[in-house]
Amino acid sequence: MKTTIKQAKDHLNQDVTIGAWLTNKRSSGKIAFLQLRDGTGFMQGVVVKSEVDEEVFKLAKEITQESSLYVTGTITEDNRSDLGYEMQVKSIEVISEAHDYPITPKNHGTEFLMDHRHLWLRSKKQHAVMKIRNEVIRATYEFFNKDGFTKVDPPILTASAPEGTSELFHTKYFDQDAFLSQSGQLYLEAAAMAHGKVFSFGPTFRAEKSKTRRHLIEFWMIEGEMAFTNHAESLEIQEQYVTHVVKSVLENCKLELKILERDTSKLEKVATPFPRISYDDAIEFLKAEGFDDIEWGEDFGAPHETAIANHYDLPVFITNYPTKIKPFYMQPNPENEETVLCADLIAPEGYGEIIGGSERVDDLELLEQRVKEHGLDEEAYSYYLDLRRYGSVPHCGFGLGLERTVAWISGVEHVRETAPFPRLLNRLYP
């Protein structure tokens, strides 16, 4: 019977065949231990010399790392294993032998591993991170579908940008200029006027020359837009969404979190409502904490965000930033028109902003004024202005960066490990 490592638990004390790769092995004179993986998990295969043909034991000692195999044997309980079971191997068939696999079981530098990312993905920890990424995506669809959102796919090639063009990748679109999208927001706002609540999930591109552990050039973003929704209601949806994702990973990725040695007690504390602190109060807090490199009207850097989030030891909303440091489409704060109705959700443990969101300007005259103030081409944004001409309503939206969120939940140091093939400032290969 052919099965997988994950499904093997349903076949205790039965003989099965599993297609797998050999990740590592060790042997003595009478027994060989094979570390096997098949994409669904990692399992140990035990080959006892006295219980198999001589050729099988000889093969078990000689097969090379990352060779592909069909392994047949009996699934038995093993309480020492993370899985709780292993295979007593009876026969081995080599599908393809690997020669001189470059990522041997020893320490390698980051650049070497990134050069071999196509192979590094096979390692146990990288496999665990990708499984957590997958669960975050699954839980995202689950949340939005249950809450009545419609999925909309905005274009990746655009003629205009939500936040100006300084950080956009330019390309030619036949005889026109085009840019790789840095957000689907403007299109989602249009879709929200048709469907009420919409979300998207897709790649975004930022031509930022950043080399921090938080930044990728290409990353995936989950964006939501909601009609007839105010800023406070939007924050509630955001915190419910993040809480749902964290709980789903805790429930469905226990083994992966264990492999990554993640301190799950920090994630177990994540619950609604999240703390909220205004930009004004955050500036005062930082001053009291000894930060003398930040003044009102300046954006926060990584050390500032980390200090604020670590104070709460939870995700925290920083609300109502100054108008002058935020994009043109954000609604003024009626209590202080030098600020806007927006919030950044900052993850604890130094992972930084994972969500940016705001209430959108819904008044045509104000939006036209903002477009001019920001030096944007009114013609390029005519479709966006139309949304305010024909039945404008209060509406809000937000975007969550997938890779940064996965980094926080999984506890990995650098965001590059949360994308299968990350695009960094100096890396376009593989």
Swiss-Prot record:
Record bears the keyword Nucleotide-binding: yes
Enzyme class of the recorded protein, top EC level: ligase
Any matching Pfam family: tRNA-synt_2
Subcellular location: Cytoplasm
Keyword Aminoacyl-tRNA synthetase: yes
GO cellular component term, pick one: cytoplasm
Reactions listed under catalytic activity: tRNA(Asn) + L-asparagine + ATP = L-asparaginyl-tRNA(Asn) + AMP + diphosphate + H(+)
GO MF term (any one): catalytic activity, acting on a protein
Family annotation (InterPro entries): Aa-tRNA-synt_II (IPR004364), aa-tRNA-synth_II (IPR006195), aa-tRNA-synth_II/BPL/LPL (IPR045864), Asn-tRNA-ligase (IPR004522), Asp/Asn-tRNA-synth_IIb (IPR002312), NA-bd_OB-fold (IPR012340), NA-bd_OB_tRNA (IPR004365)
Keywords associated with the record: Aminoacyl-tRNA synthetase, ATP-binding, Cytoplasm, Ligase, Nucleotide-binding, Protein biosynthesis
EC number(s) from the headed UniProt entry: 6.1.1.22
GO biological process: asparaginyl-tRNA aminoacylation
HAMAP family for the chain: Asn_tRNA_synth
Entry similarity comment: Belongs to the class-II aminoacyl-tRNA synthetase family.
Subunit comment: Homodimer.
Matches recorded under NCBIfam families: asnS, PRK03932.1, PRK05159.1
Protein name, entry field: Asparagine--tRNA ligase
Record organism: Staphylococcus aureus (strain NCTC 8325 / PS 47)
Lineage per the UniProt record: Bacteria, Bacillati, Bacillota, Bacilli, Bacillales
Designated gene of the protein: asnS
